[in-house]
Amino acid sequence: MKSSAIRRSRGFTVFETVIAIGVLAVLLTGFMVVFTPAAEGIRKSINVQQADRMASTLEQELVTLRSEPFTTGFNKAFTWIENKNKDKDALLVYQYRGSMTTLRNDKTPTPVPSVTGLLPGKDYVIVPMVRLRSDATNLKADLEAVEGGVYLVKCTQLVFNSSQLVAGTAGKIVDPISATMSTTPDDYPEAVIAFAAEFHLLPAKTSDYIAGTGFTAKFNTVKNPIFVRNLAVRR
């Protein structure tokens, strides 16, 4: 009888196993280096429609009179653009769930913190909003019903330089042509204030964070906005 030869398969040596583990570690490291920043960018990115909505919300709120002591929408816009580059009165843009039946004293929908058993469009609506950090009571209520992220907005007037509009000095409103300082809305000689609005996504959206020192530190050091829009307000 003819005997059949039994062929034994050879396993990996310890040396080969170590090499394979090393190659795998290099591949995983490369994957993390390439895709982790990309994932972070995707998380922070917003689409054009979202950017348009936030910019429009800011532009509209700047001239909307609520409970502030302003006589005109232009006066409000002048003051907010000039003074709101301080962390105490920082501008915040966000969306929250609002009631379709009840309003607060400032004519904004009452926040709806819990939506259990409720239907959007029937029991509540998503409200785009701009508030000052110093509007603590209303802001805290809004944040309990917030939808999506909260954005810090920094506004800087655009002025003429060599026939081009460029960013001026944050916290100051001047004649965009002569650079003469305007201390009040009545001093401002033009009918339009053009400004650049930087939108920065905040790392947290709780009222404790926004009222605390973490927000102040972020406000003073923030760079690289999610997006920037050139906007304008008119008398």
Regions found by a protein language model. Give the residues of each.
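N-terminal leader/signal peptides at the extreme start of proteins
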Residues: 1-12
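Flexible, low-complexity segments enriched in proline/glycine/serine and punctuated by aromatic residues
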Residues: 12, 19-22, 26, 35-235
